[in-house]
Amino acid sequence: MTLILGIDPGSRITGYGVVRDTGRGCEYVASGCIRTGDGPLAERLQIVFRGVSEVIRTHGPVTMGIEQVFMARNADSALKLGQARGAAIVAAVEAGLEISEYTATQVKQAVVGTGAADKQQVQMMVMHLLKLVQKPQIDASDALGIALCHAHHRQSLIPHGLASAKRRGGRLRL
């Protein structure tokens, strides 16, 4: 059983979701949002870093999936999003997690079955797949979707030789 962390990065709200991949499916472990407030960007990035670090310490995932930066119409927003991603990635690297990146389309395809799904469809499928009674916050459900996508992609690699890959320095090398 593998614990997987999913991160939906943002400079104001970063969603996180932790699932347990049992090999026969995924089970819900935890989810939530790291809220940074309206302070200076450097302080908000520190909050993202510390928040992700705390989630990793608390739940002990060994691998992380994170959403890739999309091309936003507003360059300033895209840069801030990229910096928030960087803060989350550094927290994961410092904890020794293996990291994979997924586009929003890949996540929607893995969770809903279509890359054209909206956030509410992802949220409903996350609830169904993880047998959740209450709706998670939208950023947390996106993060859980990223974790489910990561679990799906990890499983699809196993028949193609990943199981025979050699471990070097604590990281899988193909």
Swiss-Prot record:
Cofactors named for this entry: Mg(2+)
Residues bound to Mg(2+) 2: E67
Signal peptide start and end residues: none
Keyword Disulfide bond assigned: no
Main location: cytoplasm
SUPFAM superfamilies: Ribonuclease H-like
GO molecular function, one term: magnesium ion binding
Manner of cofactor binding, per the entry note: Binds 2 Mg(2+) ion per subunit.
Enzyme class: hydrolase
Keyword annotations from UniProtKB, A to Z: Cytoplasm, DNA damage, DNA recombination, DNA repair, DNA-binding, Endonuclease, Hydrolase, Magnesium, Metal-binding, Nuclease
Protein name as it appears in the record: Crossover junction endodeoxyribonuclease RuvC
Catalytic activity: Endonucleolytic cleavage at a junction such as a reciprocal single-stranded crossover between two homologous DNA duplexes (Holliday junction)
CDD domains, A to Z: RuvC (cd16962)
Gene from which this protein is expressed: ruvC
Organism: Ectopseudomonas mendocina (strain ymp) (Pseudomonas mendocina)
Tree of life domain: Bacteria
Binding-site residues for Mg(2+) 1, renumbered to this chain: D8, D139
Compartment annotation: Cytoplasm
